[in-house]
Amino acid sequence: MPVDFLTSDQKQNYGCYAAEPNDVQLARYFHLDERDLAFINQRRGKHNRLGIALQLTTARFLGTFLTDLTQVLPGVQHFVAVQLNIHRPEVLSRYAERDTTLREHTALIKEYYGYHEFGDFPWSFRLKRLLYTRAWLSNERPGLMFDFATAWLLQNKVLLPGATTLVRLISEIRERANQRLWKKLAALPNKWQAAQVMELLVIPEGQRVSALEQLKKGPVTVSGPAFNEALERYIRLRSLEFSRLNFSGLPAIQLRNLARYAGMASVKYIARMPQQRKLAVLTAFVKAQEITALDDAVDVLDMLILDIIREAKKTGQKKRLRTLKDLDQAALLLARACALLLDDNTDVPDLRQVIFKCVPKNRLAESVSKVNELARPQNNNFHDEMVEQYGRVKRFLPAVLRDLHFRAAPAGEHVLAAIHYLAELNGSKKRILDDAPEHIITGPWKRLVYDAEGRIQRAGYSLCLLERLQDALRRRDIWLENSDRWGDPREKLLQGEEWQTQRIPVCRALGHPVDGRKGVQQLAIQLDETWKAVASRFEKNAEVHICNEGKYPSLTISCLEKQEEPPSLLRLNNRIKQLLPPVDLTELLLEIDAQTGFTHEFAHVSESGARAQDLHISLCAVLMAEACNIGLEPLIKHNIPALTRHRLSWVKQNYLRAETLVSANARLVDFQSTLELAGRWGGGEVASADGMRFVTPVKTINSGSNRKYFGSGRGITWYNFVSDQYSGFHGIVVPGTLRDSIFVLEGLLEQQTGLNPVEIMTDTAGSSDIIFGLFWLLGYQFSPRLADAGEAVFWRVNKSANYGVLDKLARGYADLSKAESQWDEMMRTAGSLKLGTIHASELIRSLLKSSRPSGLAQAIMEVGRVNKTLYLLNYIDDEDYRRRILTQLNRGEGRHAVARAICYGQRGEIRKRYREGQEDQLGALGLVTNAVVLWNTLYMEEALSWMRRNGEEIIDEDIARLSPLMHGHINMLGHYTFTLPEDILKGELRALNLNINNELSP
């Protein structure tokens, strides 16, 4: 295993002064208190006192003693000398002229201040134990472990060993942890299971690829045969019975990484591994792939049912168009007959004869029959056409009933009973069903399920069950064991003793009282006071008016006037654009890496110590290939080792994945937050969320249809989150255009940057009562831009309160007693979300899909209505608030424009078939977009500094309105070189573009 994993900076800075300490570091490490001065003043001569003081403070700061104190930086020498009343630090040259003096002083410091040698017991043992725990539980890069070890040694007053000693120790510990993991995994399968997984590496007779390669490939189309194939894949994995093995005690992240590695590595490479490691890798793969295969199969089933419904609607609409002429004729004939019935001049005794004389009886009967045949009930959802597809359903329904082991919550028990009933009839050709559970047969289905004699028809019953099954699956009333995406979300909430232990800390962290009555009282008081405050100011609000023309009063909110850019801002924008130097995107990535070191976050999927020369160049090339959507081919340079086809393919397969992209992106976001200019734009507490649409012209199940965005094809949505500093801190790939509200919380809860956004802006699609409620429970502010804010329902909790001019507007009543009775459950749900035991989208999906909300869902909706009203009242009361929402949403849209410019290849279409590939590619796009934003911010700061130095006038208010979302100076097309000048590699900025006419246009 390679042991030289340190970067050049780590090697250079280990145990040395890298730069002058800042004021905080000087105060913490180099301040001498009375005890220090008493110890130092025991030495004779200024040179000895200054020397031992510098040795002491250096040991505190660096964790080691220096043999040559001239390496101590001048600022440190001066800071320490002043405290000793030594006015000439030059006396230091006389220090330690004898080696004995140096040894004596270091020994005195060690004894007096309690410093230890690295080899002393128990310090070395404690460090090894800590490092082993980290290596076992995580896939942390060895470079980070090195930094952790250095910090731990410094904190515990253990003198640093040589860098190679620490590197070798970390490498040995990592190897031991890996060997232990492989040993434990390899010991789990029995002999039969071990033999079966080894057979996966063999190419079956008559086939071209191994069984392992076949199992790697998930479904890409939606059809009955595709579902059957996906289910067979799951059954094959399930038959190995790995779900019965005990994987507890094994680190989940390590298992995921091993499984991903097996999914990407070639079969030949796995076959050449040592037996123990090979079995461990295959065991991790089978365990993870069984869950994935089940999820994929149910995904296809869900989309297949949706396709049947969509096809039925399409067929029904075509039928409707073809029969409209006949229906119109029959309706007109019946209208003539009814007109005679309504005519008061028609003699009642002769009514039938009069009607039949005008409209012949046989034609009237034909018209009645035609209307009954062609007219559709109001609640009909093309169920007739669904039943017509029973022949298609018969091809996959038996497999659903036989091979998927469903479980049910109480609300899904009737559906589960129907599933079990039909499962018992598998293989039977009975068309009429006896004693079938009838609770699932509701509304319009009754006409299609029951025949004229009241008997249950199998075709109608099967289609009815299929529709109910999909609904129950989406609500998680029906769920599957050993499934990630279709499992029971309730099991992932904090349970029993664990919740009781976390209950009080969770409530405190979220800012809610433990007592539900107190919590709802506070909320009710807040709403009442806000109503009264806004009502008292409403007469002075010229932008909002009450409209009483409709059934209920509503509000008319004037559109925000465009905020004109003053001439000074236009000049400043123009000047900065002129000063920004032109740059290739390739160089930009390398330059940002030199500034931030973001490529250090990319670790090998299974051998996280594996590095290669100029790896950062290879990583930047792969990131550009993915972000620009051009593939590796244009970037391959056979004469440059870092850009060969083999190197780039190796890097793409082993380094580019979700967790490394997230870590690298976090480094860029955190660096952006340290810049003064970014601080002028915002503090990182505000963010917006919006979707960016991409067409997917390839066959994939991870896409959806939406004619507005994807035409006649299918596509995906990249739902991403942008801070008020213009940095993108999270992104989610969504099939098609699912409701934004399902994912809006996930970006706040799962983002891993140093930002702490507490308020998020979205468009109308991200809004619902439950979302408002969950945001409040978690301590966040939800601020959507509602297209129909004036028409929205405003809620009150005090029925008798009078809110003056706004009183009639408060027509909804929020029943907070529901929230009080469910308070503990709401806190448990919020705590589970905050602690990450359940994904926000998984919980929200189950809450939103329910047509019969549970008590918990109703409680969240009630507090959501109150908080929605609080938001609406502030929205109509404060024009600055409305403008702030609009400004932040515009930032997100502007960032999308930059991302579109970067992702120019293949017409901007995403051609990855599987979810993981789509996530990796769009993660790379987000990373490169952040790199562009960061580069622009750095050079905008430099341009502003240059303008100040040259006496140009800059108005502070204009700086806050600048934007780093420009890209005209960045070349993204056709020129791919990965070289930088030496000074820029060291972190210097390139020269501004000063070869311009300094005269600005008026």
From Swiss-Prot:
GO biological process, one term: DNA transposition
Pfam families, per the entry: DDE_Tnp_Tn3, DUF4158
GO molecular function: DNA binding; transposase activity
Record carries keyword DNA-binding: yes
Keywords assigned: DNA recombination, DNA-binding, Plasmid, Transposable element, Transposition
Record-stated family: Belongs to the transposase 7 family.
Protein name as it appears in the record: Transposase for transposon gamma-delta
Species per Swiss-Prot/TrEMBL record: Escherichia coli (strain K12)
Record lineage: Bacteria, Pseudomonadati, Pseudomonadota, Gammaproteobacteria, Enterobacterales
